[in-house]
Amino acid sequence: MNFETIIGLEVHVELNTNSKIFSPSSAHFGEDPNANTNVIDWSFPGVLPVMNKGVIDAGIKAALALNMDIHKEMHFDRKNYFYPDNPKAYQISQFDEPIGYNGWIEIKLEDGSTKKIRIERAHLEEDAGKNTHGTDGYSYVDLNRQGVPLIEIVSEADMRSPEEAYTYLTALKEIIQYTGISDVKMEEGSMRVDANISLRPYGQEQFGTKTELKNLNSFSNVRKGLEFEVERQAKLLRSGGVIRQETRRYDEANKGTILMRVKEGAADYRYFPEPDLPLYEIDDAWIDEMRAQLPQFPAQRRAKYEEELGLSAYDASQLTATKALSDFFETAVSLGGDAKQVSNWLQGEVAQFLNAEGKTIEEIRLTPDNLVEMIAIIADGTISSKMAKKVFVHLAKNGGSARAYVEKAGLVQISDPAVLVPIIHQVFADNEAAVADFKSGKRNADKAFTGFLMKATKGQANPQVAQQLLAQELQKLRD
C-alpha cells in the first residue's frame, strides 16, 4: 500500500524589537544569564504588562507579507501551564483572535511549477525562559528570553513531501527577513520549527494520526527528520501497526527520530482573555502605514531581474537570498553597473570573501559605488581581472575609492607599447638561453617569455597588449 504524506509546520519567529513585548528589558541575544530581566519578567506580585507597540507593528507587517487577513479588534489570552522557565505559570499569547489569519505564500516546486501553501494563522506571544540542566545535579533558569516577542506562523497541512516543507521554510524565511521584523537566525533561536506529519492511503480524505517533531535546528534537519518519519510510519502501517499521537525529537547523531512523550489527547491550557491588557483596535490607517514600510519581496525581485535585466533564474535566486544582498545589487545597477558583471562579482569573489570571513555584506566596507568603480577600471584597462581580486580584498577590508587605491598602490596596468617594448628587450637580454631555445625552434619556447615579462612588470602588464607586443618582438628575433 502506498501512502500520501501530510505535513504542516509551526514556525516561531523572534521579533527584533529593542525591548520585550510587555517589559522594558532588553530583548537582545547573547547576554549573561538573567542580565536582561526586571520585575515584570520575574513576575513579582502586583506588576502589570505594558504592550510594546513595535510588536503589533511587526505583526501587521508579517500578516501583510503573508497575504493574511488582519483582525481589526485584537486581544491577548492567557495560556495556562506550569514550568520553571515560566514564572507566571501562564503565557500571554493569542487564542481565538490572532493578529493574522487566512494567509498563503507561493513556493516553486522541483519541476518548475508553483504551489500555494495556506497559512492558518499568525499570532503574537511572549517567549519563555530557558532551563539548563547542569552536570552538578542542579537545574538553572535563565529568564533573558522570557518575554521576548514572538510571532508563531502556523501553516495548513498543505505540504506533501519533506522537500516541499524545506522549500516552504526557505520561502517563509526570505519573506520574513525582507520585512525586517526578524533576523531569522536559527543558530540563535530567532527562528524555530516544529513539524506535524501523518500518512494516509492515497484517495482517503481523512488525515491519519499525526506525529509532532521537535529539535529541528536547521532546515536540513527538518527535511531529514520528516524523511525518516515517512519511512518509519509507512513501515509501521504496512506491518499492521498503529500510529500513536506522540511527540518525537530528531537525533542528528543517529539520523532518526526518538520518542519524547505520548499525547493522550489535546492539552488543556484553559485559555481565557488576558485581563491586564486592553482590546487593541487596528484601523486602516495603521495597516496602510505598515504596508508603506514593506519592501518589494523576493518573488517580485526575481521576476524583475530575469525579465528586465536578463539574468538567469539561478542568478536571480542567488541575488535575492537576503534583502541586504539584493539591495546592494540594485544600488550597484542603478549607479550604472552592468547587471551581469555585478552579479558575477557578488556570487564569485564577494561570496567567497564573506564565507571565509564569516560575515554578511553589511559587515564589510565594500559599497555598491566602490564595486561599480572597480568594474569600470577593469573595463577601461586600468587594472587586469587578476589584479582586481587584490583590489577587491582591499576595498572589502578598508573601503574607499578603487581608482585612488590602484593609483596610490602602483597597481595601474601597463598598456603603453612605449613602456612595454623596452622591458621586453630587457627580458630578452636577461634570458639568453630562452632566446636561443626559441631561435632553434624548440617547441613552446615562446611561452616562457610571457612569465618573464609579467615578473618583470610585477604583474602589471596588460595581458592582451603584452601578448601582442611579445609576438611582434619575437617575430623580429626569428627574422
From Swiss-Prot:
Role played: Allows the formation of correctly charged Asn-tRNA(Asn) or Gln-tRNA(Gln) through the transamidation of misacylated Asp-tRNA(Asn) or Glu-tRNA(Gln) in organisms which lack either or both of asparaginyl-tRNA or glutaminyl-tRNA synthetases. The reaction takes place in the presence of glutamine and ATP through an activated phospho-Asp-tRNA(Asn) or phospho-Glu-tRNA(Gln).
Gene transcribed to yield this protein: gatB
Similarity annotation: Belongs to the GatB/GatE family. GatB subfamily.
Catalytic activity: L-glutamyl-tRNA(Gln) + L-glutamine + ATP + H2O = L-glutaminyl-tRNA(Gln) + L-glutamate + ADP + phosphate + H(+); L-aspartyl-tRNA(Asn) + L-glutamine + ATP + H2O = L-asparaginyl-tRNA(Asn) + L-glutamate + ADP + phosphate + 2 H(+)
PROSITE patterns: GATB (PS01234)
Lineage: Bacteria, Bacillati, Bacillota, Bacilli, Lactobacillales
GO BP terms, alphabetized: glutaminyl-tRNAGln biosynthesis via transamidation; translation
The protein, known as: Aspartyl/glutamyl-tRNA(Asn/Gln) amidotransferase subunit B
One Pfam family in the UniProt entry: GatB_Yqey
InterPro entries linked: Asn/Gln-tRNA_amidoTrfase_suB/E, Asn/Gln-tRNA_Trfase_suB/E_cat, Asn/Gln_amidotransferase, Asn/Gln_tRNA_amidoTrase-B-like, GatB, GatB_C_1, GatB_Yqey_C_2, Gln-tRNA_amidoTrfase_suB_CS
Transmembrane segments: none
GO MF annotation: an example: glutaminyl-tRNA synthase (glutamine-hydrolyzing) activity
Record's subunit section: Heterotrimer of A, B and C subunits.
Catalytic activity, EC: 6.3.5.-
NCBIfam families: gatB, PRK05477.1-1, PRK05477.1-2, PRK05477.1-4
Keywords, ordered alphabetically: ATP-binding, Ligase, Nucleotide-binding, Protein biosynthesis
